[in-house]
Amino acid sequence: MRTMKVLARYFNIYLALALLPGLVASCETGKKKAQTAALRVHIEALPDAAGTSQPVSVLRSEPVLVNIKKEPILTEANLINAKVIEARGGFALELRFDENGTWLLEQYSAANNGQHFVVFGQWGEKRSEGRWLAAPFISRRISNGILVFTPDCSREEADQFVAGINEATKQIHKGLLK
């Protein structure tokens, strides 16, 4: 015959198991969360009635409206790595793409000479904030898989973006290798 003491012991075990995830989570709150980021590279396009393009405002100090295709041509899934590099008068971002991204970058740059790539980025712990970072002019075919541009952000924001995008890229490639 079971008594209340036996049931109480099982209840305490279940209570401890239920509280365990909360205790573990509270112990981890002191750890710094990994940065995360997202990248979308769009191509300039003519306005169309089909709704496949949209105007976006690039540059905060002197906004410029650029009409883009809604679907990005490149994302962080195509990226190998990103880095902040020294450039004349400041810094720039260098995005190095994988084989598929290199092919896409070459095809779109060759076919859209005289237009713009338009780069959107999101970064931070929650990736809630994001903005249009740049609209680099396409002056030649880019066959080396590297897109370099001066972003509309501070050096600190650029460092956060690069750390987050490299972490996101690492997670994507880790998932593909499993």
Residue ranges with predicted function:
Residues 2-6, 27-178:
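Structural signature of multi-pass, alpha-helical inner-membrane proteins
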Residues 1-25:
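Sec-dependent bacterial lipoprotein signal peptides
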